[in-house]
A protein has these predicted regions:
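The feature captures the beta-strand-to-loop junction immediately N-terminal to the Walker
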Residues: 36-38
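Conserved ABC transporter NBD signature motif
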Residues: 59-67
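ABC ATPase nucleotide-binding domains
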Residues: 76-79, 83, 87-230
Length: 250
């Protein structure tokens, strides 16, 4: 498990137009942090810079107390789960899950033990001989999560992993991810635009708009004690009603 710290981060895909502006937050070991906001607010960009896939223009990133701005992605011990599953279509579920261990030159018996163990934990042990085309979307996502977790990363990044699933399956996997987090105690940074998902899963929520943090807090804090009008109107269904007044009510 890793502790993550970001200080005054600026980043973007064009130097003159930063996507992220003065981003600062920390993630404690074993915490489940959800980055929440509308499309284009910068939440996936944060995930990508934590993983080392885009450079940091300014500011500092620390993983377990070590400055990691220029640390190559392969040396960060981070795993990532994507929206589109990203499974190898010609490989079975077993081979997909085993791939990162084979790439790291684990012994064959250790690979077999690790793959079967995580498969049982995620309820996919009966799918190990199937290829992705023979599995449902939910089953493929479980395999993708198993592949990410099998090498015991210190930090797990999840980029809208449930957004391609139907409502019923999304609810089921949401519960399973929460249960899995409790059982393995991993440090997780999770991206979503779905407020129900964020409020259900998060230890704390980081709510973003236009590349800037609007509020950081527990689900209870951001819902019942919004820091500004944006947070108040973004959360809740139906949305709250706003009105203007010239009088201050004591």
């Amino acid at each position: 498990m890793s502790k993550l710290e970001l200080y005054n981060i600026y980043a973007g895909y064009e130097e003159s137009k930063p996507v992220l502006k003065d981003i600062s937050f920390f993630v404690e070991k074993g915490e489940f942090i959800v980055l929440l906001g509308t499309s284009g607010c910068g939440k996936t960009t944060i995930l990508n810079l934590i993983a080392g896939m885009i450079p940091i223009s300014a500011g500092e990133l620390y993983i377990d107390g070590v400055k990691s701005n220029d640390t190559p992605p392969r040396k960060r011990n981070i795993a990532m789960v994507f929206q589109n599953y990203a499974l190898y279509p010609t490989m079975t579920a077993y081979e997909n899950i085993a791939f990162p261990l084979q790439n790291a030159h684990y012994k064959k018996k250790d690979i077999d033990s690790s793959v079967k163990s995580i498969a049982v934990e995620l309820g996919i042990d009966d799918l190990l001989e199937r290829k992705p085309a023979e599995m449902s979307g939910g089953q493929q996502q479980r395999v993708a999560i198993a592949r990410a977790l099998v090498r015991k990363p210190s930090l797990l990044l999840m980029d809208e992993p449930l957004s391609n699933l139907d409502s019923a399956l999304r609810n089921q996997l949401r519960f399973e991810i929460k249960k899995l987090h409790k059982s393995i105690g991993a440090t997780i940074v999770y991206v979503t635009h779905d407020q129900a998902e964020a409020l259900t899963l998060a230890s704390r929520i980081i709510l973003l708009s236009n590349g800037m943090i609007q509020q950081i807090g527990t689900p209870h804090e951001v819902f019942y004690e919004p820091a500004n009008e944006f947070v108040a109107t973004f959360l809740g269904n139906p949305k709250i009603n706003l009105f203007t007044s010239n009088n201050l009510i004591a």
